[in-house]
Amino acid sequence: MLAAIADIRGITLRVEPQGSNGTADAVVFNVPDKAAALRCRAALLEQTISTKILPEATTWHFAETWTHMPELVAAHGGTLTEAFPRSRARLEASVSLPVFVNMAADFPSRVASA
């Protein structure tokens, strides 16, 4: 799948931090902004390809929404709404594609055509 999308203009593949180990359950890439990520997701859905977590799951997979953690809220002056603007921008401009063990042979080409 990486080869199918690596040369698409406007897509930057995510680089995993040094020393980390990926779980190999998703391919994550970045696009210029939130609007592009949402357009990408819509195009993928037209190809019957769902995304995994990004861009849609920032409401529960992002520390900005973790108001149930009083220590985190207190550490950021009582509100998390504007505590992580760079993280929000990066997450909103990310798309995550699921990786399956028995992926259909045409899956990468369908991703690329979206």
Model-derived features: positions:
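Conserved core segment of the aminotransferase class I/II
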Residues: 1-10, 38
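Conserved glycine-rich beta-strand-loop-beta hairpin in the small C-terminal domain of fold type I
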Residues: 2, 13-30
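Short amphipathic beta-strand starts and helix->beta connectors
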Residues: 7-14, 78-83
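Short, solvent-exposed loop/turn segments at secondary-structure junctions
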Residues: 18-20, 34, 57-60, 101-103
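Alpha-helical elements of Rossmann-like donor-binding domains used by nucleotide-donor carbohydrate transfer enzymes
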Residues: 26, 110-114
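Short, conserved charged micro-motifs
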Residues: 34-41, 103-110
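Conserved PLP cofactor-binding pocket of PLP-dependent enzymes
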Residues: 41-95
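Short, proline-centered helix/strand-breaking motifs
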Residues: 97-99
